[in-house]
Each structure stands twice: as structure tokens, then as C-alpha cells.
């Protein structure tokens, strides 16, 4: 019986000894693994958690967080992804390789790194050094990125010839715009890929299409010393060459327009458009300083009568129908007069347009149209449309008339009607080609258009074109010497009140088409369109 008790006691003692030894082993064993610590460290880096990174590192430097902030700012890092590979151990240390993917402005930079680890108080810790960021990074160094921009592409005419130099007319230079070297402040505002001295577009097409023209820079990730001198290239991205911006400008037509404006003593502008597709062939301003051809706004005067004439033809009035053209007419309380010297009396509708009879148009507008019908015709020819030729322009504006008298005045281009050479050249182009096309100046890249093309009734278009030819052959422009086959319309637009009993000052207009070229000319304060603007059109057409 004693033996059984003894053996039981011995057995119990053995269990106690083994239990104590097992507990000591558990207390002395190193916690975790090098891979687990590396994963925690890399995860903290990815979420920009410097406190957590310190917790996984052995004696981290005081500027640990600053080192990683320098990395983010220097490279423009927006995202970090890093994952550990297979660990290896030697003695009391371990190495864990990692894969890093840093999202930079130019793309994702992929590289391989490694972390060294050792145990400290039975825990694996990262032995931090600059090599923990990148294997080629050493004390006193940092990573940065440099950019080299490609040669800037060109703004070119329809035939591919450059138009972004100083050898083109000032009107073209205004549209193309300017470039300039960035200041340090401007470069910082644009982002890390820009530096002081880089060339960027400042205005016009150069500014709007800057990214296309500039291309993308070649970027090099480099190790740099404390003075920011490059030590070694460790990564990079290939840049892309800029691409030309192609315009519809026709150099020959542009030269003809510019020459036609030479010698003018008052501000003058002209636009030429190809009727078949709405492409802008020429833009000319004299003098320079303000792009009045595209951005100016003026009452169109009697040139707008072609729009009203189309609305009247659509209402059933025929070119051969007889209309009244009194010297004066009272329409809704508004007394309408004709310009001095204009023929009056009964005449055909064609003659009323050819002679530019204000009263005939006012009376027929009152009789046959309403604000909706007149506005519909204006919209068909591009008024009130959101046009975008590829540069900043002012579209024609035709507010819907609110009274009979206002409609009568609006019908011959006064009141609140506003236009410029671009919008009236577009009207002429619509009549010449049968469709009003949203004007286009930049053809490549293609600019999205909100404006919709307006298709004219073919019979009415033909009738209106014939009526406009009568303006040149027998009407107000018969003495301008325009080439045979020209169709057009003169305009004399009041823009202020007369003083001391004198007639109000007027802008001089002429718009029309010949072949596949439509155009409009306006001379500010030029008086009568037949005497001032039509001769400019003659010089232009003769030079083509």
C-alpha cells in the first residue's frame, strides 16, 4: 500500500516540474514573426500612420515621419501599396523583401525593397534606415522626381502650316493666344510636374488646348543628396509628345481679308466662312487689341432683314408680291422711317430687300409674323445658340420681342438685336449652302457642339439667295463694284441717339456670299454700309 502512495507522489511531482518548465518556455518565446512585423509596418506606411510605424521599428529616428512626408511630397505620392514577400533568417536577424507600388502624378512606380528585422524584448522589430524606404537610399539622401517636357506642338492652319508665330497677322495671333514661362508661384500652383521656366499657354487656343500641345513630360525618379543634386536614377516614366491643334484657317483667304482692311481709319472686322461646312476661313480685325470680329456685339441693322425675309417667305409672302414702302409708318405706336435717299412707294418684296425699305419690313412683320415666328427664324440662323468654334466668341442674340413695335424694330436689326461679323457671316453661309452650320475653327481635336445645325427650306433658300443678288445688281450695293454672282445685304445700324438734331451715328455693315465663301464686314461708326463696308467686301472678293 505504501508503494502505491509513493509512486503516486512521484508522478504528481513530475507533472508539477513539467508544468513549470512549459510556462517558462512560453514566457521566453519570441512573439510573432518577421513577416507579421513587416506586414504591420508596411500597412502603417500605406495608411500614412507614422505612430504605428514607430511601434514596429527598433529605435526609430526622431524624423521618421518627416522622412516619409518628404517622400510623399517630393514624388507627389497619392497612394501607397506595399506587401511583404518570403522572409529569410540568419543568426538573430531576418530579412523580409517587399513589393511597393507608389501612385505618382505620372503613373504607378513599382519597385522591390527589403526590411531588416531583429528581436527586441522577444518581439521582431524593423531595423529602420533610409534603405527601408528604397534599397538605393542612404543617409542624407532623399527621393525626388524630375520632369523634362517635350517640344511643344504647333497650332496650324488647314494646310498644316504653323500659325503660332509672330509672322502671322495680329488677328490670328489674338485667336491663337500666347505662351509664357511659369513663375515659381505659378509652377507650384499647377503641381509637381511643373517648374519655374516651363512654357504653358496663357490665352486663346494655346491656353484652352495646353495639355494637348504640351504633351506629357518624361519623369525620372532619382536619389538626390542634401543639396538636391542627383545621385542615381531609380525609376521613371516615358513622356508623350504634344500634338498639333489644327484649325480651319485658310492662309490665302486670311491674307485677302487682312489686306482688304488695310487703310481703314475706323475699327473694322471681317469673318469668312465656308457655307458647305461652317468652317471659319478667315478672321480679321483692324486695328488690333480687341477681337471685335468674334467677341464684339453690335446691332446688325438691315443685314438682319435677310433673317426676317426668310420668316416672311415662310409665312407665304412671295418675292414678286407687291408691298408698301412709305416714307414713314406707325407700327404699334413706334414711328418707323427709311434712310434718306431710299426709294419708296409700292414695290415687290424683292425690291424692298434690295432697296432696304425699313417701313415695308416693319409693316409686313406686323401683318404676317409674331414674336415666336421671328424668333424661330433667328434661332435657325444661329442666334441664341451656344456655339463653340474652339475659342471664345460672342454668339448672336435675338431676345424675343414683347410688343408689336419692338418686333417691327427687331425685324430690321435694331432694338435689342446683337451680332458680330462671325454671326452675320454665319447667316450668309446658311443662305448660301442651305444649312446653317455651327461655326468651326478648331477641327482637330474635334470640339463638341451644343448648337444644332439649321436646315433651310430649299425653295425658300433659293428665293432668298436670288433676292440678295438683287441687292448687288439693282439695290443698295449696285455701285460697290462687287464681282458678278455676289449675293449680299447692306446694313446701316444705329447705335446711339443723335445730338443737336443730327442723325444718330451708325455702324456700316455688308454681308454676303460668292461661291463657297460667305462673309460679313462691319465698320464701327462707318455710316452707310453701301459706301463703307461693301467696298471692303469688293477688295476681299477680288483678292481671292
Give the location of each predicted region:
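Short regulatory alpha-helical segment in sensory/regulatory domains of signaling proteins that mediates
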Residues: 42-46, 72, 261-262, 382
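Solvent-exposed, polar/charged alpha-helical surfaces in well-ordered, non-transmembrane soluble domains
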Residues: 35-43, 47, 51, 55, ...
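Hydrophobic alpha-helical transmembrane signal-anchor segments
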Residues: 2-24, 91-97, 116, 123-126
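Beta-lactam-recognizing serine transpeptidase/beta-lactamase-like catalytic domain environment
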Residues: 232, 268-297, 311-525, 529
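Extracytoplasmic/periplasmic proteins that interact with beta-lactams or build/remodel peptidoglycan
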Residues: 73-269, 507
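Short solvent-exposed beta->alpha transition segments
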Residues: 30-36, 40, 47-97
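C-terminal region of N-terminal signal peptides and the immediate post-cleavage residues
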Residues: 4-11, 17-50, 436
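Soluble non-cytosolic domains of exported or imported proteins
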Residues: 32-36, 47-48, 59-62, 150, ...
Amino acid at each position: 500500500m505504501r508503494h502505491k502512495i509513493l509512486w503516486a507522489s512521484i508522478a504528481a511531482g513530475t507533472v508539477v516540474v513539467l508544468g513549470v518548465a512549459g510556462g517558462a518556455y512560453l514566457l521566453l518565446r519570441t512573439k510573432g514573426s518577421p513577416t507579421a512585423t513587416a506586414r504591420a509596418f508596411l500597412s502603417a506606411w500605406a495608411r500614412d500612420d507614422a505612430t504605428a510605424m514607430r511601434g514596429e521599428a527598433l529605435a526609430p529616428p526622431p524624423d521618421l515621419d518627416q522622412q516619409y512626408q518628404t517622400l510623399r511630397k517630393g514624388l507627389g505620392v497619392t497612394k501607397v501599396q506595399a506587401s511583404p514577400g518570403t522572409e529569410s533568417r540568419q543568426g538573430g536577424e531576418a530579412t523580409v523583401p517587399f513589393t511597393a507600388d507608389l501612385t505618382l502624378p505620372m503613373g504607378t512606380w513599382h519597385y522591390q525593397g527589403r526590411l531588416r528585422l531583429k528581436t527586441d524584448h522577444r518581439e521582431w522589430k524593423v531595423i529602420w534606415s533610409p534603405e527601408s524606404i528604397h534599397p538605393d537610399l542612404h543617409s542624407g539622401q532623399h527621393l525626388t522626381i524630375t520632369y523634362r517636357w517635350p517640344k511643344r506642338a504647333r497650332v496650324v492652319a488647314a494646310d498644316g502650316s504653323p500659325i503660332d508665330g509672330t509672322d502671322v497677322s495680329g488677328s490670328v495671333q489674338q485667336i491663337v493666344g500666347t505662351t509664357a514661362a511659369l513663375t515659381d508661384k505659378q509652377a507650384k500652383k499647377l503641381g509637381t510636374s511643373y517648374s519655374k521656366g516651363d512654357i504653358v499657354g496663357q490665352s486663346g487656343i494655346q491656353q484652352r488646348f495646353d495639355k494637348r500641345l504640351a504633351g506629357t513630360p518624361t519623369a525620372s525618379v532619382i536619389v538626390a543628396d542634401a543639396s538636391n543634386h542627383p545621385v542615381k536614377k531609380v525609376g521613371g516614366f516615358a513622356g508623350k509628345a504634344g500634338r498639333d491643334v489644327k484649325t480651319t484657317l485658310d492662309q490665302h483667304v486670311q491674307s485677302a481679308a487682312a489686306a482688304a482692311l488695310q487703310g481703314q481709319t475706323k475699327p473694322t472686322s471681317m469673318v469668312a466662312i465656308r457655307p458647305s461646312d461652317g468652317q471659319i476661313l478667315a478672321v480679321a480685325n483692324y486695328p488690333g487689341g480687341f477681337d471685335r470680329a468674334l467677341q464684339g456685339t453690335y446691332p446688325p441693322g438691315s443685314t438682319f432683314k435677310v433673317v426676317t425675309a426668310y420668316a416672311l417667305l415662310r409665312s407665304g409672302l412671295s418675292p414678286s408680291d407687291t408691298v408698301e414702302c412709305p416714307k414713314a409708318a406707325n407700327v404699334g405706336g413706334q414711328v418707323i422711317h427709311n434712310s434718306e435717299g431710299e426709294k419708296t412707294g409700292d414695290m415687290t418684296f424683292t425690291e424692298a430687300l434690295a432697296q432696304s425699305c425699313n417701313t415695308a419690313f416693319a409693316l409686313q412683320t406686323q401683318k404676317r409674323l409674331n414674336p415666336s415666328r421671328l424668333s424661330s427664324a433667328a434661332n435657325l440662323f444661329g442666334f441664341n445658340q451656344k456655339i463653340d468654334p474652339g475659342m471664345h466668341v460672342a454668339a448672336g442674340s435675338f431676345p424675343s420681342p414683347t410688343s408689336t413695335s419692338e418686333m417691327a424694330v427687331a425685324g430690321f436689326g435694331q432694338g435689342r438685336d446683337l451680332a458680330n461679323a462671325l454671326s452675320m457671316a454665319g447667316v450668309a453661309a446658311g443662305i448660301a449652302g442651305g444649312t446653317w452650320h455651327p461655326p468651326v475653327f478648331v477641327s482637330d481635336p474635334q470640339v463638341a457642339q451644343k448648337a444644332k445645325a439649321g436646315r433651310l427650306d430649299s425653295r425658300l433658300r433659293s428665293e432668298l439667295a436670288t433676292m440678295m443678288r438683287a441687292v448687288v445688281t439693282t439695290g443698295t450695293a449696285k455701285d460697290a463694284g462687287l464681282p458678278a454672282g455676289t449675293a449680299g445685304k447692306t446694313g446701316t445700324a444705329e447705335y446711339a441717339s443723335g445730338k443737336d438734331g443730327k442723325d444718330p451715328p451708325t455702324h456700316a455693315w455688308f454681308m454676303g456670299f460668292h461661291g463657297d465663301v460667305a462673309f460679313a464686314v462691319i465698320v464701327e461708326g462707318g455710316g452707310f454700309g453701301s459706301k463703307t463696308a461693301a467696298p471692303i467686301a469688293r477688295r476681299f472678293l477680288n483678292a481671292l
